[in-house]
């Protein structure tokens, strides 16, 4: 390319050949021949100028001709690479399937955990829940333990979302193991619209829950509908199992607290699991 910029070639470019399509080398030579004469260029004859032009033309064509370009390598031309990618895609799909299945299973387990745990606590008395579902013959044949007096305290709470008045009718009563007792809670709806509430409960100390038995299902875990300004009494019929007096862990326990909490029943609302607060 250095020959193109000798004084003679600059003269050709200055005279306007640069802006005219040269066509074939012969035609280009005819156009620039008057300017390549020795008296015009001072760098040699027309033959030398044609050699420069031919050299420039060949270089230009060589740089642009597709046949002279190095072959391009197509992506994914390696069959082993394609096979590996297909294997990776298959593994990723399998992993995503497993993850989705685990997520769905965990979601279903979370919805079933509350009722299952509630049933377990009511059956075993663990987690501070009273034991429910006892045969009447056991109640009739119980022998009260007269020398062991237990104080039962009652507590009532209302969640902030529920505008109810809820309180126990009695703050405390005294019972002995093997003796039945009846207590009442009172709830009132002071608003001007019907409200549905649902309650949960727990017992303190937690270890005493397995001895606190409800003779019949109380109002807990069931929806309670109160119309505007309606007020109702809610009974709790229970007894302390006589085995309470034989448990070494209960030797120093002379106070048991039964606590209820009411929540507004709404679609998608989950009750707290009965037990530890």
Swiss-Prot record:
InterPro entries: CtaG/Cox11_dom_sf, Cyt_c_oxidase_assmbl_CtaG. Its main location: mitochondrion. GO terms for molecular function: copper ion binding. The chain crosses the membrane at residues 95-117. The keyword Protein biosynthesis does not apply. PANTHER family: CYTOCHROME C OXIDASE ASSEMBLY PROTEIN COX11, MITOCHONDRIAL-RELATED, CYTOCHROME C OXIDASE ASSEMBLY PROTEIN COX11-RELATED. This is Cytochrome c oxidase assembly protein COX11, mitochondrial. It comes from Pongo abelii (Sumatran orangutan).
């Amino acid at each position: 390319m250095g020959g193109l910029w000798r004084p003679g070639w600059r003269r050709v470019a200055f005279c306007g050949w640069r802006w005219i399509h040269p066509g074939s080398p012969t035609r280009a030579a005819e156009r620039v021949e008057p300017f390549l004469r020795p008296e015009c260029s001072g760098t040699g004859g027309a033959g030398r100028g044609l050699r420069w032009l031919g050299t420039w033309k060949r270089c230009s064509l060589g740089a642009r001709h597709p046949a002279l370009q190095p072959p391009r390598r197509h992506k994914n031309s390696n069959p082993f690479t394609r096979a590996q990618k297909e294997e990776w895609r298959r593994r990723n799909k399998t992993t995503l399937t497993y993850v989705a299945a685990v997520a769905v299973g965990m979601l279903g387990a979370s919805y079933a955990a509350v009722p299952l745990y509630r049933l377990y606590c009511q059956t075993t008395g663990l987690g501070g829940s009273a034991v429910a579902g006892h045969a009447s013959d056991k109640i009739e044949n119980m022998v009260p333990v007269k020398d062991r007096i237990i104080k039962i305290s009652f507590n009532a709470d209302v969640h902030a979302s529920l505008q109810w008045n809820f309180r126990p009718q009695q703050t405390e009563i005294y019972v002995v193991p093997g003796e039945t007792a009846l207590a009442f809670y009172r709830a009132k709806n002071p608003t001007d619209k019907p409200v549905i509430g649902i309650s949960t409960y727990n017992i303190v100390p937690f270890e005493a829950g397995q001895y606190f038995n409800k003779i019949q299902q109380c109002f807990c875990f069931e929806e309670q509908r109160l119309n505007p300004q309606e007020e109702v009494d809610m009974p709790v019929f229970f007894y302390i199992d006589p085995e309470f007096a034989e448990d070494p862990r209960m030797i120093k326990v002379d106070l048991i607290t039964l606590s209820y909490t009411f929540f507004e029943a709404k679609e998608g609302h989950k009750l707290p699991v009965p037990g530890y607060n």
